[in-house]
Amino acid sequence: MLSCLSKPALRCRSVNRLQFLRKLSLQEIQTLKTQHQYLGRTRLDVETPSLKPSAAGSGSTAPKPVTEREIASTRFMPRKNVIKLTPLAVEHLKKMQSSASMKGKMLRIGVKQKGCAGQAYSLEYIEKPDKFDEIVKQDGISIIVARRALLQIIGSVMDYRDDDLQSRFIFSNPNVKSTCGCGESFSTLK
């Protein structure tokens, strides 16, 4: 494999470098461009010939060059949401946010010291998130997770239940170590 560091002509910026690059095959030029982009260097100053198949009908074409945009898109991988919402929870949140008194407000999920087991979920509507709060967007709904609750809530699933006695949000949290008898409070793994 051709390495750009093994060729002395590529280390200097001179006319000799351009002459050397013009003598390279198309495959070698594409390899050099890929190496330079991968290593974070600027692209090479050489024009790549068109990649049309020859008229002789050889049928082989050079590989497609990797663009700077493709390299940049692999540097940052999308993150998973801190909390997932079930379709019932999304539907109920949309109904709540469509009411006149809740326009422009978002639900903020937090954890506070309360109950037999030590911690309980707190839900409140706010207009503006705090500086380090996490905003979760799913199915057209935006909710906020308080920064102090991120470690306790991460990986949870939020559901909505409406039965004969009560209607409430239910959290399925993989970080819970134990819950109290009534189910209102919990303790997490440390």
Swiss-Prot record:
Region: Disordered, residue numbers: 49-71
Annotated Fe cation binding sites: 116, 180, 182
Any GO BP annotation: iron-sulfur cluster assembly
UniProt KW keywords: Iron, Metal-binding, Mitochondrion
Entries under InterPro entries matching the protein: Fe-S_cluster_asmbl/transfer, FeS_biogenesis, FeS_cluster_insertion, FeS_cluster_insertion_CS, HesB-like_dom_sf
A GO CC term attached to the entry: mitochondrion
An annotated Gene Ontology molecular function: iron-sulfur cluster binding
Subcellular location: Mitochondrion matrix
Presence of keyword Metal-binding: yes
Lyase as UniProt keyword: no
Pfam families: Fe-S_biosyn
Stated role: Involved in the assembly of mitochondrial and cytoplasmic iron-sulfur proteins. Probably involved in the binding of an intermediate of Fe/S cluster assembly.
Family: Belongs to the HesB/IscA family.
Protein name: Iron-sulfur assembly protein 1
Lineage of the species this protein comes from: Eukaryota, Fungi, Dikarya, Ascomycota, Taphrinomycotina
